[in-house]
Curated annotation (Swiss-Prot):
It is an enzyme of class 5 (isomerase). Residues 160-330 form the TRUD domain. Keywords: Isomerase, tRNA processing. One of its GO terms (molecular function) is RNA binding. This is tRNA pseudouridine synthase D. The keyword Hydrolase does not apply. SUPFAM superfamilies: Pseudouridine synthase. PANTHER family: TRNA PSEUDOURIDINE SYNTHASE D. The active site is at D85. The keyword Isomerase applies. It holds the Pfam family TruD. It catalyses: uridine(13) in tRNA = pseudouridine(13) in tRNA. It comes from Campylobacter jejuni subsp. jejuni serotype O:2 (strain ATCC 700819 / NCTC 11168). Responsible for synthesis of pseudouridine from uracil-13 in transfer RNAs.
Amino acid sequence: MNLEEENTIFKPLYSLKHSPINAYFSKNSDDFVVRERPLYEFSGKGEHLILHINKKDLTTNEALKILSEASGVKIRDFGYAGLKDKQGSTFQYLSMPKKFESFLSNFSHPKLKILEIFTHENKLRIGHLKGNSFFIRLKKVLPSDALKLEQALMNLDKQGFANYFGYQRFGKFGDNYKEGLEILRGKKMKNVKMKEFLISAFQSELFNRYLSKRVELSHFANDFSEKELIQIYKISKEEAKELKKQEQFFKLLKGEVLGHYPFGKCFLCEDLSAELGRFKARDISAMGLLIGAKAYETGEGLALNLENEIFKDTLEFKAKMQGSRRFMWGYLEELKWRYDEEKAHFCIEFFLQKGSYATVVLEEILHKNLFE
């Protein structure tokens, strides 16, 4: 697999099979709203202030710069649980040293509001959130397309979704991962944060390609015979039978890495029949590889073979990255929707665990790339 010679953006496979649905989506502050959900309650005491903010059409870093200039707090002294996109309206939490509290009473900005202030013992860190709730408004939706949207949402609610990394990881032209590969090959870059971001884009690209291969396997297992699966994947008759027996869409594989969902340690899938029950109950999920020296290793069999197809040409860089695992299969929570036929608006609300992308879910529903 020669990544740097590819001229087209890789498009992961969808898990649902319907045709594209016509709807208009604009990622603006009225039609795309994100609400961060903290991992824990704030204590009400300590040396840090927690600011609950609403920002519109600003990145998290742009919001921090505005607050820094107004307060005198250095950007590095702010804390946040997650970086949020520029487009849309975002409600999120930031932390800052309490000694700068006095500036808050006079703070005013047209795109940035401070809604609430809490006190806490520690600075917010990346990952200190449970997840995010989303509101999405689609426009120009005909009644026939509204019915298709409802069916797609019911299917996703039942089966879950492929937890791909979103376009935000890969840049305007979808090729950030190529720059990450160049850095791993020795290209120098002074900006440490940008260097880390580009390397993570490389890891994310490989993760998406492997997950897409697993989605393909799941489709094939549903649609093809045991004999055809044996020919395609060079597996035993028993392994083909195991695949065909699995009723859920996303097929688990013996020897792959699983994790307790939505938070928990990794472990190998040794007893497939036992783990299938826990997977269907949404207690565990399959974990894809973010390549690196410390990532939990896959065991054996088809899971390892498929992984090697994607990662074999990049193993020389493994020691240069820490690595980890990421859930490949996620679930919509608190899902609801409503259709206003008169306005031709279709509104969707749901909650996602941290690290999942609402735009990935929306692309799966609509079956088209949002920002081409």
